[in-house]
Structures are given as structure tokens and as C-alpha cells.
Design a protein with these regions (language model features):
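S-adenosyl-L-methionine-dependent methyltransferase catalytic module, highlighting the catalytic core
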Residues: 5-7, 18-27, 31, 135-143, ...
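Active-site micro-motifs of SAM-dependent methyltransferase domains
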Residues: 111, 132, 163
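Conserved N-terminal segment of class I S-adenosyl-L-methionine
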Residues: 1-120, 124, 141, 238, ...
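Short, low-complexity intrinsically disordered segments
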Residues: 58-61, 116, 151, 179-183
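A conserved short alpha-helix in the GNAT/GCN5 acetyltransferase fold that borders
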Residues: 131, 145
């Protein structure tokens, strides 16, 4: 991992003093916090999203580094939800260690309606690298909208399925997982190949993503059908998170927006800033 920005390193140093926070969680929190403070918060503010005094929810929060960065922008309330109990436990420990107040809960946005206290409650909702795992994109957006205030903001980021590693083949932990564009193989060959993965759960995940195949075009249609206002769309050759993970600067690919096919193959990230109608 490249050298972290000073502000991020201070947070990582704080949680390093805790024996109950492992190196895996420190790593993921560190790059998430860096992404939130160096890119996501400045981007949202540049688009007119008010973070100070805002109620903010991240769906699929992981180790909640992004939430921590947004909390430091003066948010009134931050809530992280995830399907994994370990992620929730880690987030609670990390927030305690860095002295930030947050609420965390296990919640499935597809099968569970939001609790009354969350319904129509949030000014800002984030879905980072989550929506591509949800089987019905439009329905998922509608469920997320239940959490949002009228006029609330939704920030969505995902790797298009046909981008070099959009099939999440890195999960396979085998030689195949190191190769780009394996999702372009015919179904019989692709299926035979990914079933050689070491872990059954990873086989299931890659298979599910194969069924969903979330593309830029599919995402645009889902946004339109869900009646969300599209405020901004950004495409990237190199994702902003690569700066934190690998030291590679973000490179935009917005000129591909109007080139069907090529945009799906070449853009490693698509991000959307959306707004719920008043």
C-alpha cells in the first residue's frame, strides 16, 4: 500500500493501538478513509451536496472509513449498514478508537424495510461497490430511496461488468482470477473455468454477478425508471481508489459516455450522483 496522506495515517495510527482491531481492518479502514477525505467529500461538496449538519447513511459500509471521513465534515449523524456482522463489529471498534460517533446495524435493504427511524431520514446515502451485487438494479434503487429524504442525494459507484475485472474474478484466488476480460468467454467455458475456484462462496458470488451483468447502460435505464434525477455521471480508466491502494492517480474516461460498447469495456468505474425528487 502506498504512503497514506498525513490525515489518514493519523487515523490508522490511532486504531493500531487497539489489539482487538486486526491488520485487515486497519488496511481497509485506511484506504476507505483516504478515499472519503481525499476524493468523495470534496467531490460531493463541489456538486452542491451539503455535508455539514447532514444525516448520512452508507449501505455496505465495510470498515466505515468513508463514513468516518464524512463525519469529520460536520455531519449531524452517520449510519453504516452491512450484511456482515464482522464488518459491523469492526466499524464500532474503529469509531470508538478514533473518537467518532456513529451507528451501525446489520440490515438487508432488499428483504427488510427500513426501520421507521430511517425511513425518509437521510440527506445523503452512499452505495460504493455494492449495487453490482444486487440482483434487480431498479428495484434496489427504489428500496434505497425509502431511506432518503425528498431532495436527498444518492452517490453510487460500481465497476461495469464488462470492464477488465468487472466479473470480480479476483475473488477466485486462482490463475483465472488474474486475467482480465474472462467474462467475455462463452458461458460454458466461463462456467467451467470459475468453478475451479478454491472457495464455494466465491464461485457463487462470481456466478451471481454473471447473472446480473450490471453495465453503464443498464444503470442509466434503472435510474430513469426509478424516477431519480441524474445530477452527474463520471467514468474512469483508473479508479480514484487506486490512488490509495496502488499510488496510481485517477484518470477520467468521460469522453466514452456517448460511445456504447467501448465505454463498457474500457471504463473501470462508473459513478453517479443522483437526487430524489422533492
Amino acid at each position: 500500500m502506498p504512503k497514506l496522506p498525513p490525515r489518514t495515517q493519523k487515523k490508522v495510527d490511532l486504531i493500531a493501538t487497539r489489539d482487538d482491531i486486526n491488520s485487515y481492518d486497519r488496511y481497509y479502514f485506511g484506504y476507505q478513509y483516504g478515499l472519503g477525505s481525499e476524493y468523495i467529500a470534496p467531490y460531493l461538496k463541489s456538486e452542491g451536496v451539503k455535508l455539514e449538519g447532514a444525516t448520512i447513511c452508507e449501505i455496505g459500509c465495510g470498515e466505515s472509513g468513508v463514513l468516518a471521513a464524512l463525519a469529520e465534515e460536520g455531519a449531524a449523524e452517520v449510519v453504516g449498514i452491512d450484511l456482515r456482522d464482522l464488518a459491523i463489529q469492526s466499524s464500532e471498534k474503529i469509531f470508538e478508537a478514533v473518537g467518532i460517533k456513529g451507528e451501525f446495524a446489520i440490515h438487508n435493504i432488499i428483504t427488510q424495510p427500513p426501520p421507521d427511524k430511517w425511513r425518509g431520514h437521510f440527506d445523503v446515502v452512499l452505495l460504493r461497490d455494492v449495487i453490482e451485487h444486487l440482483e434487480e438494479t431498479e428495484l434496489s434503487l427504489r428500496h434505497v430511496m425509502d431511506f432518503m429524504k425528498p431532495g436527498g442525494w444518492l452517490y453510487v459507484v460500481f465497476p461495469p461488468y464488462y470492464s477488465p475485472f468487472g466479473a470480480h474474478q479476483h475473488l477466485l484466488d486462482n490463475t483465472l482470477g488474474k486475467l482480465p476480460y474472462i467474462q467475455l468467454l462463452p458461458d460454458p467455458i466461463f462456467t467451467k473455468a470459475y468453478k475451479k475456484a478454491r472457495l464455494h462462496i466465491d464461485v457463487e458470488e462470481v456466478s451471481m454477478l454473471r447473472g446480473i451483468r450490471l453495465t453503464i447502460g443498464k444503470m442509466r435505464r434503472a435510474i430513469k425508471n426509478a424516477l431519480l434525477d441524474l445530477v452527474d455521471e463520471q467514468l474512469y480508466f483508473l479508479r480514484p481508489v487506486f490512488k490509495l491502494k496502488f499510488g496510481l492517480p485517477p484518470i477520467k474516461a468521460n469522453f466514452l459516455k456517448h460511445i456504447p460498447g467501448l465505454r463498457e469495456l474500457a471504463a473501470l468505474e462508473a459513478s453517479y450522483l443522483l437526487r430524489k425528487k422533492l
